[in-house]
Amino acid sequence: RAGVVLQVGFNRRFAEAWATAAAAVHNGAIGTVQRLSSLTRDPGPFTADPARIAPATIFNETLIHDFDTLNWLNAGSEPVEVYAVADALIRPDARSSGFRDSAVVTIRYDNGAIATAEASFCAMYGYDLRGEVLGSAGMVQMGEPTSSGARLFTAAGKSVTTAGTDTSRYHPA
């Protein structure tokens, strides 16, 4: 009615490597999904004041993208178990306020697949965004610290593409 487009900001769905990987998973190129992983590490050094950051920020603003990615890649399945551990490893002095800067989450889906999501607020080597889906017939990997390409591994071999680094992977999106 307002004539504007409204969209939730889950930008990985529009990044080329992630869309390519999702297509491979969804068209059955890697078979039945067994394991998924998604990793987000923000570039360091971490300079924000932990007192100004809500305690659950690592979950609500960082890992939320990993959760969306895992659910998108494992389309049609629902999480049935979730376990999380988080701590203030970068800023242990902020631990008592509830601030968490590092977290790992394990998810079991109703189709039997198991997923992990990992986040950190401080990767001194730069922005690091990666993912992987292991299936009964192959594997697809997305991103790495020096590349944003998708890599597909099957019995037929592997395919590798490389692209820009840092946030340039989202420029076309």
Predicted regions and their residues:
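Alpha/beta-hydrolase-fold catalytic nucleophile elbow
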Residues: L39, V85, L134
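Structural detector of well-ordered beta-strand residues that form the stable sheet scaffold
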Residues: V5-Q7, S37, Y83, T116, ...
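A general structural signal for well-ordered alpha-helical segments in protein cores
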Residues: A17-W18, D66-F67, A173
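Rossmann-like dinucleotide-binding domain that binds NAD(P)(H)
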Residues: F46-I114, S120-Y125
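A contiguous active-site-proximal alpha/beta segment in oxidoreductase catalytic domains
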Residues: R1-A48, A56
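C-terminal glycine/acidic-rich active-site capping loop/insertion
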Residues: N11, R95, Y109, L129-A173
